[in-house]
């Protein structure tokens, strides 16, 4: 049906902007965009620009590999060695921060910034660890890179710096988990996610995942409770979010 629709309008060419408006133009133009413009008539995907992408403070390789799968030149960086094969710099991100990146996805440590650790904030203020965390966060956020996403859980940077541009959940993008994630964006659009199917898009939202309720009344995602004491597991980016970043920003 889509082939008939496209082949029946200007033989696969973009419609003439000077002709009178037709009620079906909006639908046609949306299909034209989704299917790749003039290349869609030939079954060829539109050529995309290859970006140099730095994924800062990532040892899992999840976001890095999502961008590589899209044809980009991506490299992860962390003080820890990588968990999976692929381009990775083991060391300080500041060693390579100014190496001509087009985009950076940064995951600065949240240990001293997240609201979940509020009970220890006074101690962290006194020993300087919180200020070190703030300084590290801001150096990444203010880096001389055209496109930047800084990711962190809900924490003090929302008040010390500015509110995040977007707050997302893994279940928005196909993973049945809850993990409130804040994104501060520079020259990047908010990640698109779809609650329910519509004419053009399939829903990306899924179930939120199992929750655990403690005797105190506190409620917590089961996966998060079971990963207590494993900060590395809790810090990983979910596959659905990584894929959305690569598809929409790459």
Predicted regions and their residues:
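Glycine-centered signal
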Residues: 13-14, 44
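Conserved active-site and SAM-binding loop architecture
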Residues: 30-250
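Intrinsic-disorder-associated, low-complexity terminal segments enriched in Asp/Asn/His/Tyr and depleted
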Residues: 10, 16-21, 26-29, 39
